[in-house]
A protein has these predicted regions:
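Append "Primarily bacterial transcriptional regulators
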Residues: 45-52, 61
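Amphipathic alpha-helical interaction segments
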Residues: 70, 102, 106, 120, ...
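Hydrophobic alpha-helical connector segments
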Residues: 74, 88-116, 141-142, 166
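Short secondary-structure transition hinges
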Residues: 109-146, 175, 179
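Amphipathic C-terminal alpha-helical segment
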Residues: 166-184
Length: 195
């Protein structure tokens, strides 16, 4: 057999995609999901797009999340936990403003700064469809209880009614702002609310 007729071994192909290992893939995926949601909303998020954004194989997200909804629940849980920290910090600040006003301002800022995540938390079926003993339900309830506690400390009649009325005002403003109906910063409207 001469040199020209020898079979050549196929050259090994190298992948264009970088091989990337995350020390904390779960955290990297959640961060990538938050970024994607902030830019494009939750409706466009797929586990494949998330894997590309995180620089990992398309199967990698399935090591941590059963499906897309499982990932969205994890993002929403973190959102409610962050909202609770924000509200708790505002309530503990003290100062001339009432606790309700401080919490209201913090709530409005959170909603305004996290529009698409806020939509995921409050304008999706995730919380209503979650089992009451789930991490998501508990995280959502904690944020409401912080608001309820602050309103009831003020001695308003019927803390559930008052807290729900305060929450309805805040939520309504955040959603109106998110949908483009309120041009000014939400905190500027704080003095007009029935707090």
């Amino acid at each position: 057999m001469n040199q020209d007729t020898k079979t050549k071994k196929p050259e090994k192909r190298t992948r264009d995609r970088k091989s990337y290992h995350h020390g904390d893939l779960y955290r990297a995926l959640l961060d990538a999901a938050r970024e994607e949601i902030a830019v494009n909303g939750a409706q466009s998020l797929t586990l494949a797009s998330l894997a590309r954004r995180a620089g990992v194989a398309q199967s990698a997200p399935y090591r941590h999340f059963a499906d897309r909804d499982d990932l969205l629940v994890a993002v929403a849980v973190e959102g409610f936990q962050e909202l609770s920290v924000t509200l708790r910090d505002a309530a503990n600040l003290g100062g001339d403003d009432s606790g309700v006003r401080r919490i209201a301002a913090a709530y409005l800022r959170f909603g305004e700064q996290n529009v698409e995540r806020y939509r995921l938390m409050f304008a999706s079926r995730l919380v209503p469809d979650a089992p009451t003993d789930s991490l998501l339900s508990k995280a959502a309830e904690e944020s409401y209880q912080l608001l309820l506690g602050c309103v009831s400390e003020r001695g308003r009649s019927g803390p559930y009614g008052s807290a729900t009325a305060v929450w309805a005002q805040l939520h309504g403003l955040v959603m109106l702002k998110a949908d483009g109906f309120v041009p000014e910063p939400l905190v500027a409207l704080l003095s007009e609310l029935a707090l």
